[in-house]
From Swiss-Prot:
Protein name, per record: Succinate dehydrogenase assembly factor 2-A, mitochondrial
A GO-annotated cellular component: mitochondrial matrix
GO biological process, one term: mitochondrial electron transport, succinate to ubiquinone
Compartments (UniProt record): Mitochondrion matrix
Organism: Drosophila mojavensis
Length: 157
């Protein structure tokens, strides 16, 4: 299939003559400068898309809960939180008691927006009182990375 596409005359002309690709564009800048936005833009929650409540699992054994939290910390769908939470869990979750494990479960599953967790952990936004627990304080300390540990990938399982 690729050979057929490459052998077509129109594709060959584009490959041989790259100026044809740019023929429609005038005043193309040599250098593009990017700037960071001055503030975080948060939109109000849409009333049309209700987020279901996370089911509370009171009878879940502690080891099963820790295994579930390990998985959920690694699979957030957001690379920043994947790295922060997976390294946090690898370091601290094994030593958590039932109360601390419940606090961590509430933190990562009670919030409907993962960006909130990220902003709270990095002290970009103030943490609401219901999530300002000992586990959150420990997470904030972990995010500061005072030991200068390299966190470019998730820890091995």
């Amino acid at each position: 299939m690729l050979r057929q596409v490459l052998s077509s005359t129109s594709v060959r002309r584009l490959l041989v003559s790259p100026t044809r690709c740019m023929s429609g564009k005038q005043n193309v800048p040599d250098k593009i400068e990017y700037s960071t936005p001055p503030e975080i833009i948060d939109y109000e929650e849409s009333p049309h898309l209700p987020v279901p409540e996370y089911p509370i699992r009171p009878d879940e054994p502690l080891e099963t809960r820790k295994q579930r939290l390990l998985y959920q910390s690694r699979k957030r769908g957001m690379l920043e939180n994947d790295l922060l939470l997976s390294t946090f869990v690898a370091k601290y979750l094994k030593d958590f008691d039932a109360e601390e494990t419940a606090q961590y479960d509430q933190l990562i599953n009670g919030v409907s927006n993962d960006w909130d967790i990220y902003y709270w952990a990095t002290n970009t936004k103030p943490t609401p009182p219901e999530y300002d627990t000992d586990v959150m304080k420990l997470l904030k300390q972990h995010v500061k990375n005072t030991e200068r540990v390299q966190r470019i990938r998730q820890p091995d399982l």
